[in-house]
Amino acid sequence: MSDCYTELEKAVIVLVENFYKYVSKYSLVKNKISKSSFREMLQKELNHMLSDTGNRKAADKLIQNLDANHDGRISFDEYWTLIGGITGPIAKLIHEQEQQSSS
């Protein structure tokens, strides 16, 4: 990855690459991840951030609710929405911890 990318651009590239890593590794359907493979990806890739039971339950609920077309597979758009939904509560927690440490 080029050093000319900003930290945010690098993060986006990692998210995109991670999706396609699991598509090619686990999915028979092109450009989609099964729900079970997505859960496995979360366990491997976000294990520390989802160690809180509440975060894990919230992630499971999002997975159940987001499969818009009910095909049991997660498209890239669904994945992107899921990642946003999962990171929202984590971002809030990080912000609260930063507030506490600065006071």
UniProtKB/Swiss-Prot annotation:
Binding-site positions, Ca(2+): 67, 69, 71, 73, 78
User: Quick check: keyword Transmembrane helix in the entry?
Assistant: no
Q: What keywords are assigned to this protein?
A: Calcium, Cytoplasm, Metal-binding, Nucleus, Repeat, Zinc
Question: What GO annotations for molecular function exist for this entry?
Answer: calcium ion binding; calcium-dependent protein binding; protein homodimerization activity; RNA binding
Task: Enumerate the Gene Ontology biological process terms.
Answer: response to calcium ion
Q: Which compartments is it annotated to reside in?
A: Nucleus, Nucleolus; Cytoplasm
Q: In which tissues is it expressed?
A: Ubiquitous. Highly expressed in esophagus, adipose tissues and colon. Expressed at lower level in lung, brain, pancreas and skeletal muscle. Expression is up-regulated in tumors of bladder, lung, thyroid gland, pancreas and ovary. Expressed in astrocytes.
The EF-hand domain is annotated at 12-47, 54-89
What GO cellular component term, any one, is given? extracellular space
Q: Does the keyword Isomerase apply?
A: no
PANTHER family listed in its UniProt record:
PROTEIN S100-A16 (PTHR11639:SF76), S100 CALCIUM-BINDING PROTEIN (PTHR11639)
* Notes on the domains: S100A16 proteins, but not other S100 proteins, have only one functional Ca(2+) binding site per monomer. Upon Ca(2+) binding, undergoes conformational changes leading to the exposure of hydrophobic patches which could be implicated in the Ca(2+) -dependent nuclear export. Binds Zn(2+). Ca(2+) and Zn(2+) do not bind to the same site. Does not bind Cu(2+).
Listed under subunit, the entry gives: Homodimer. Interacts with TP53.
Query: Under which name does UniProt file this protein?
Result: Protein S100-A16
Its gene is: S100A16
